[in-house]
Amino acid sequence: MNETKTDSTVNPDQSSQELVFFNYHEYLVPGSDDTSLVINHFPNIHTDLSSSTFKETRIIRIPRVYHTVQFPDLIPQFSCYYPGSEPGAITSTQLMSGSFDDNSFNESSSIPSLENIISRSEFENIVSLVNESLAVAFNPMSKRMLLENLLDLLSGGLFLSLLNFLGIYSFTKRKLMELESQIDSINQINEKKGVDFKIISPRVTGYLSLDFQITKPR
Protein backbone atom coordinates (compact mmCIF):
# COMPACT_ATOMS: atom_id res chain seq x y z
CA MET A 1 0.00 0.00 0.00
CA ASN A 2 1.32 3.40 -0.94
CA GLU A 3 1.69 5.93 1.87
CA THR A 4 0.96 9.59 1.40
CA LYS A 5 3.22 11.89 3.34
CA THR A 6 2.33 15.48 4.09
CA ASP A 7 4.83 18.13 5.02
CA SER A 8 3.37 20.48 7.64
CA THR A 9 6.43 22.69 7.84
CA VAL A 10 6.05 26.27 6.66
CA ASN A 11 8.80 28.15 4.91
CA PRO A 12 9.41 31.43 6.78
CA ASP A 13 9.48 33.25 3.45
CA GLN A 14 5.95 31.98 2.74
CA SER A 15 4.45 33.17 6.02
CA SER A 16 1.32 35.24 5.63
CA GLN A 17 1.73 38.99 5.44
CA GLU A 18 -0.40 41.56 7.18
CA LEU A 19 -3.60 42.21 5.25
CA VAL A 20 -3.95 45.60 3.60
CA PHE A 21 -7.31 47.38 3.91
CA PHE A 22 -9.25 48.14 0.72
CA ASN A 23 -12.82 48.95 -0.23
CA TYR A 24 -14.30 45.52 -0.88
CA HIS A 25 -17.26 47.05 -2.74
CA GLU A 26 -14.99 47.90 -5.67
CA TYR A 27 -14.54 45.57 -8.62
CA LEU A 28 -12.78 45.59 -11.98
CA VAL A 29 -14.16 45.39 -15.51
CA PRO A 30 -12.20 45.14 -18.77
CA GLY A 31 -11.28 48.48 -20.31
CA SER A 32 -9.46 49.50 -23.47
CA ASP A 33 -5.79 48.80 -24.25
CA ASP A 34 -5.66 45.88 -21.84
CA THR A 35 -6.53 48.08 -18.86
CA SER A 36 -9.15 47.46 -16.21
CA LEU A 37 -11.63 50.06 -14.99
CA VAL A 38 -12.25 50.33 -11.26
CA ILE A 39 -15.98 50.38 -10.56
CA ASN A 40 -16.26 52.50 -7.42
CA HIS A 41 -19.63 54.24 -7.72
CA PHE A 42 -22.93 52.51 -8.22
CA PRO A 43 -26.57 53.00 -9.30
CA ASN A 44 -28.69 54.98 -6.85
CA ILE A 45 -30.98 52.24 -5.61
CA HIS A 46 -32.27 54.55 -2.87
CA THR A 47 -34.48 56.50 -5.25
CA ASP A 48 -37.14 55.79 -7.86
CA LEU A 49 -35.45 54.03 -10.78
CA SER A 50 -37.52 56.03 -13.27
CA SER A 51 -36.70 59.41 -11.72
CA SER A 52 -34.26 62.05 -12.93
CA THR A 53 -32.42 61.67 -9.62
CA PHE A 54 -31.59 58.07 -10.49
CA LYS A 55 -30.18 59.14 -13.86
CA GLU A 56 -28.17 62.07 -12.50
CA THR A 57 -26.72 60.65 -9.28
CA ARG A 58 -24.54 57.76 -8.15
CA ILE A 59 -23.83 56.02 -4.84
CA ILE A 60 -20.46 55.71 -3.11
CA ARG A 61 -20.32 52.80 -0.67
CA ILE A 62 -18.12 53.14 2.40
CA PRO A 63 -17.35 49.64 3.70
CA ARG A 64 -18.03 48.39 7.18
CA VAL A 65 -14.94 47.64 9.29
CA TYR A 66 -14.50 45.11 12.06
CA HIS A 67 -11.23 46.02 13.78
CA THR A 68 -11.91 49.34 15.52
CA VAL A 69 -14.21 48.39 18.43
CA GLN A 70 -15.09 45.53 20.72
CA PHE A 71 -18.12 43.49 19.64
CA PRO A 72 -17.76 44.55 15.96
CA ASP A 73 -20.51 42.12 15.00
CA LEU A 74 -22.92 44.07 17.23
CA ILE A 75 -21.59 47.61 16.77
CA PRO A 76 -21.55 48.76 13.12
CA GLN A 77 -18.52 50.87 12.20
CA PHE A 78 -17.42 52.24 8.85
CA SER A 79 -14.10 53.06 7.22
CA CYS A 80 -12.80 56.60 7.75
CA TYR A 81 -10.53 56.36 4.70
CA TYR A 82 -11.37 58.87 2.01
CA PRO A 83 -12.27 56.87 -1.13
CA GLY A 84 -9.07 56.13 -3.00
CA SER A 85 -6.78 56.69 0.01
CA GLU A 86 -7.12 53.21 1.51
CA PRO A 87 -3.79 51.39 2.01
CA GLY A 88 -4.88 48.78 -0.53
CA ALA A 89 -6.39 51.23 -3.01
CA ILE A 90 -5.56 50.94 -6.70
CA THR A 91 -3.61 54.02 -7.80
CA SER A 92 -3.15 55.50 -11.26
CA THR A 93 -2.19 58.81 -12.83
CA GLN A 94 -5.01 58.51 -15.36
CA LEU A 95 -7.95 60.82 -14.70
CA MET A 96 -10.50 59.15 -16.94
CA SER A 97 -9.93 55.89 -18.79
CA GLY A 98 -13.29 54.86 -20.16
CA SER A 99 -16.95 54.20 -19.55
CA PHE A 100 -18.96 51.26 -18.32
CA ASP A 101 -22.74 51.03 -18.22
CA ASP A 102 -22.88 54.65 -19.47
CA ASN A 103 -20.76 55.91 -16.55
CA SER A 104 -17.20 57.22 -16.40
CA PHE A 105 -14.48 55.38 -14.50
CA ASN A 106 -10.69 55.31 -14.41
CA GLU A 107 -7.96 52.86 -13.48
CA SER A 108 -7.77 53.91 -9.83
CA SER A 109 -9.87 53.71 -6.68
CA SER A 110 -10.17 57.50 -6.52
CA ILE A 111 -13.19 59.40 -7.81
CA PRO A 112 -11.82 62.53 -9.55
CA SER A 113 -14.87 64.72 -8.96
CA LEU A 114 -15.34 63.79 -5.31
CA GLU A 115 -13.01 66.39 -3.80
CA ASN A 116 -15.00 69.10 -5.59
CA ILE A 117 -18.09 67.89 -3.73
CA ILE A 118 -16.81 67.04 -0.25
CA SER A 119 -13.40 67.59 1.30
CA ARG A 120 -11.44 64.93 3.13
CA SER A 121 -11.98 66.63 6.50
CA GLU A 122 -15.74 66.92 5.95
CA PHE A 123 -15.89 63.28 4.91
CA GLU A 124 -13.95 62.14 7.99
CA ASN A 125 -16.12 64.26 10.29
CA ILE A 126 -19.30 62.71 8.90
CA VAL A 127 -18.05 59.13 9.17
CA SER A 128 -16.72 59.79 12.69
CA LEU A 129 -20.10 61.21 13.72
CA VAL A 130 -21.89 58.12 12.42
CA ASN A 131 -19.38 55.74 14.03
CA GLU A 132 -19.49 57.45 17.42
CA SER A 133 -23.30 57.52 17.44
CA LEU A 134 -23.54 53.83 16.54
CA ALA A 135 -20.92 52.90 19.14
CA VAL A 136 -23.00 54.55 21.85
CA ALA A 137 -26.31 53.17 20.57
CA PHE A 138 -25.26 49.54 20.15
CA ASN A 139 -22.72 49.03 22.94
CA PRO A 140 -24.08 45.91 24.71
CA MET A 141 -22.02 46.58 27.84
CA SER A 142 -23.25 50.12 28.53
CA LYS A 143 -24.99 50.57 31.88
CA ARG A 144 -28.24 51.76 30.31
CA MET A 145 -28.38 48.83 27.90
CA LEU A 146 -27.66 46.33 30.67
CA LEU A 147 -30.29 47.89 32.92
CA GLU A 148 -32.93 47.95 30.19
CA ASN A 149 -32.24 44.35 29.23
CA LEU A 150 -32.40 43.25 32.86
CA LEU A 151 -35.72 45.02 33.46
CA ASP A 152 -37.10 43.64 30.20
CA LEU A 153 -36.04 40.13 31.20
CA LEU A 154 -37.57 40.40 34.67
CA SER A 155 -40.82 41.79 33.24
CA GLY A 156 -41.11 39.12 30.57
CA GLY A 157 -40.62 41.61 27.75
CA LEU A 158 -43.17 44.11 29.04
CA PHE A 159 -40.68 46.83 29.98
CA LEU A 160 -39.54 47.75 26.47
CA SER A 161 -43.06 47.26 25.13
CA LEU A 162 -44.28 49.80 27.68
CA LEU A 163 -41.54 52.26 26.73
CA ASN A 164 -42.51 51.99 23.06
CA PHE A 165 -46.20 52.39 23.92
CA LEU A 166 -45.46 55.56 25.90
CA GLY A 167 -43.28 56.93 23.10
CA ILE A 168 -40.18 56.91 25.30
CA TYR A 169 -38.45 54.08 23.44
CA SER A 170 -35.32 52.18 24.36
CA PHE A 171 -31.93 53.83 24.81
CA THR A 172 -30.71 52.34 21.53
CA LYS A 173 -33.70 53.58 19.56
CA ARG A 174 -33.43 57.07 21.04
CA LYS A 175 -29.77 57.30 20.03
CA LEU A 176 -30.54 56.05 16.53
CA MET A 177 -33.31 58.63 16.21
CA GLU A 178 -30.80 61.32 17.22
CA LEU A 179 -28.45 60.10 14.50
CA GLU A 180 -31.25 60.18 11.93
CA SER A 181 -31.99 63.78 12.95
CA GLN A 182 -28.32 64.75 12.58
CA ILE A 183 -28.13 63.13 9.15
CA ASP A 184 -31.27 64.97 8.03
CA SER A 185 -29.81 68.24 9.30
CA ILE A 186 -26.55 67.77 7.37
CA ASN A 187 -28.47 66.85 4.22
CA GLN A 188 -30.68 69.93 4.53
CA ILE A 189 -27.65 72.20 4.99
CA ASN A 190 -25.96 70.71 1.91
CA GLU A 191 -29.15 71.12 -0.10
CA LYS A 192 -29.41 74.81 0.85
CA LYS A 193 -25.76 75.33 -0.11
CA GLY A 194 -26.29 73.58 -3.42
CA VAL A 195 -23.84 70.82 -2.51
CA ASP A 196 -24.64 67.62 -4.41
CA PHE A 197 -23.90 65.32 -1.50
CA LYS A 198 -26.44 63.36 0.54
CA ILE A 199 -25.93 60.90 3.38
CA ILE A 200 -28.06 57.77 3.18
CA SER A 201 -29.01 56.54 6.64
CA PRO A 202 -27.04 53.37 7.46
CA ARG A 203 -30.32 51.91 8.71
CA VAL A 204 -31.48 51.79 5.07
CA THR A 205 -28.53 49.56 4.09
CA GLY A 206 -28.88 47.33 7.13
CA TYR A 207 -25.61 48.80 8.46
CA LEU A 208 -23.68 46.86 5.80
CA SER A 209 -22.31 50.02 4.19
CA LEU A 210 -22.50 53.78 4.62
CA ASP A 211 -23.84 55.15 1.35
CA PHE A 212 -23.32 58.66 -0.01
CA GLN A 213 -25.26 60.09 -2.94
CA ILE A 214 -23.24 62.29 -5.31
CA THR A 215 -23.69 63.85 -8.72
CA LYS A 216 -22.92 61.43 -11.53
CA PRO A 217 -19.19 61.74 -12.35
CA ARG A 218 -18.52 63.00 -15.89
From Swiss-Prot:
Subunit structure of this chain's protein: Interacts with ERF2.
Compartmental location: Endoplasmic reticulum membrane
Keyword flag Hydrolase: no
Protein keywords: Endoplasmic reticulum, Membrane
One Pfam assignment: Erf4
Gene name linked to the record: ERF4
Cellular component GO terms, alphabetical: endoplasmic reticulum membrane; endoplasmic reticulum palmitoyltransferase complex
Annotated family: Belongs to the ERF4 family.
Keyword Membrane: yes
Membrane topology term: Peripheral membrane protein
Protein name: Ras modification protein ERF4
Domain of life: Eukaryota
Listed InterPro entries: Golgin_A_7/ERF4 (IPR019383), Ras_palmitoyltransferase (IPR051371)
Gene Ontology BP terms: protein targeting to membrane
Function: The ERF2-ERF4 complex is a palmitoyltransferase specific for Ras proteins. Palmitoylates RAS2, which is required for its proper plasma membrane localization.
